[in-house]
Amino acid sequence: MAQWDDFPDQQEDTDSCTESVKFDARSVTALLPPHPKNGPTLQERMKSYKTALITLYLIVFVVLVPIIGIVAAQLLKWETKNCTVGSVNADISPSPEGKGNGSEDEMRFREAVMERMSNMESRIQYLSDNEANLLDAKNFQNFSITTDQRFNDVLFQLNSLLSSIQEHENIIGDISKSLVGLNTTVLDLQFSIETLNGRVQENAFKQQEEMRKLEERIYNASAEIKSLDEKQVYLEQEIKGEMKLLNNITNDLRLKDWEHSQTLKNITLLQGPPGPPGEKGDRGPPGQNGIPGFPGLIGTPGLKGDRGISGLPGVRGFPGPMGKTGKPGLNGQKGQKGEKGSGSMQRQSNTVRLVGGSGPHEGRVEIFHEGQWGTVCDDRWELRGGLVVCRSLGYKGVQSVHKRAYFGKGTGPIWLNEVFCFGKESSIEECRIRQWGVRACSHDEDAGVTCTT
């Protein structure tokens, strides 16, 4: 009977074993490593923890489903056995009652048989329960071992997953730091580029202003040189006229001298006898001045005199001739790509025309302004202005420019005077113009041009 009494203790041991297997989320989370110091934000940590907990709950569910199935099968088997034993007792118990009142021996025999039967049933029940418990214990032991192995594998995978997550967090932190540094470097570089761009634009603007001033100075110098050349030509012409006049006078004097010498050669004088002395005559008139003698030697230089009063400024001279074309400058930066054209050829200008020439490529320059055609005065009229006019009319370039109404005098108003062009303008209206409508110029100074065909 001691063996039968040990059955509840074994059942308690199995219950303790089952209780030892039970675990919850807190025990599992306690096994997890502490939070990394240099990790991502709180939301990312919560997401990773939620994922780990969901995985753990799924594993626990997978482990508990077979256990519940085995326990349910054992309970069903035990109930089936109880039902069979109860049916046997029900079949045996009515037999002594059906025979009525028998002898006492039969009653004792029946009681002994019933007692033995009950003992046998209890032993059979205990053996069946013990056998079932042994089978359950073996199955549970095997299952617990498998569960422990799986749980250890899950913990190992979780630890490796957390370590990899921590490594990724460290890598992400390093990448974020490097990105912050790179962003700072890019901002500094952008600021330096903007500063350099501003300086370059400022220097370019200053250089453009200096180039304009230099071109104006060159233009003024060319005008002064042209005026000096015209003065030189005028003085040379005057000197040539004076020399021609002096040569004529010299030739006349030589001719007179030759005639006088011939006359003196033909005169002969005969000396007669001396006459009586006459009375003293009156004093005659003074004779003519003699021929000036040769200049004497140069004397020693005298002392330097005091500085005299500065004279009045002279009259502005005539504009000088046009200077030679300068060397081409450096190539500028490449401009932006222009918009797509319509495909049609460039039309000739409708505001400029050439009149009075031998063909359409030359003539007097006339401009249409305020509904009327007018001419251009030839003051400061040079090749760059003629180049702009020829290009606006569709020609390749300029051959020469003309002044002083070379193609005849025009009629109507004189619109422009002292036109200054750089040679890159598309029309003469884009050149530097002081004013429209000139009164200090006449049609004797109308400008003309000959374009290259």
From Swiss-Prot:
Membrane topology (Cytoplasmic): 1-50
Pfam families per UniProt: Collagen, Macscav_rec, SRCR
Gene Ontology CC: collagen trimer; low-density lipoprotein particle; plasma membrane
Extracellular side: 77-453
Glycosylated residue positions: 82, 101, 142, 183, 220, 248, 266
Annotated coiled-coil segments of the chain: 194-255
SUPFAM superfamilies: SRCR-like (SSF56487)
Protein's UniProt keywords contain Lyase: no
Localization terms from the record: Membrane
Domain Collagen-like stretches: 272-343
GO terms, molecular function: enzyme binding; heat shock protein binding; Hsp70 protein binding; Hsp90 protein binding; identical protein binding; scavenger receptor activity
Disulfide bonds: 377-441, 390-451, 421-431
GO BP: protein homotrimerization; receptor-mediated endocytosis
Keywords, comma-separated and alphabetical: Coiled coil, Collagen, Disulfide bond, Endocytosis, Glycoprotein, LDL, Membrane, Phosphoprotein, Receptor, Signal-anchor, Transmembrane, Transmembrane helix
Chief location of this protein within or outside the cell: membrane
Ranges annotated as spanning the membrane: 51-76
Taxonomic superkingdom: Eukaryota
Region (Spacer) location: 77-108
Region: Disordered, residue numbers: 267-295, 313-349
SRCR domain sequence ranges: 352-452
Residues annotated with Phosphoserine modification: 27
Main function: Membrane glycoproteins implicated in the pathologic deposition of cholesterol in arterial walls during atherogenesis. Two types of receptor subunits exist. These receptors mediate the endocytosis of a diverse group of macromolecules, including modified low density lipoproteins (LDL).
Name of the protein: Macrophage scavenger receptor types I and II
